[in-house]
Amino acid sequence: MLDSRPHVGVLDTSVVIDITRIQRDLLPNELAVSAITMAELAAGPHATLDFEERARRQDLLQRIEASLDPLPFDTEAARAFGRLYASEFQQEKKARGARALDLMIAATALSHRLPLYTRNPQDFVAISEIVEIIAV
């Protein structure tokens, strides 16, 4: 049987957090993450007071750091971010805070011409004609 999955895809932070709960055949053959996702994961252990949750988040961060080299948020990604921001602005949406981070991750995928895998496809409806969004 032919494998129809994209060869490479960028995982949104929501997918990385839930990676052990997602069927492997729903994901691309080769996993990629943005440096922005790595930043969100690095912040995660500091965003909880629960010791066990902090340890779980730190473990996830270390496993991802050991297994994936993040795609940089470089000049091409910055240009792509501008394009995505403009699209949202035209639809009267504001890309600030966590929303801006989502757009930066999507911009990284766009700049590398890769699909973006997410658990939150509704967050990307406004840009789904620009970036290929795959819900998992």
Label each residue range with its predicted role.
Residues 1-62:
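Short, well-structured N-terminal submotif of metal-dependent ribonuclease cores
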Residues 3, 69-115:
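Active-site neighborhoods of divalent-metal-dependent phosphate/nucleic-acid chemistry enzymes
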Residues 15-16, 77, 122-123:
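Alpha-helix capping/helix-boundary segments
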Residues 49-52, 89, 134-136:
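Short, hinge-like loop/turn segments at secondary-structure boundaries
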Residues 1-4, 106, 110-136:
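Acidic, PIN/NYN-like endoribonuclease modules and their adjacent C-terminal/linker elements
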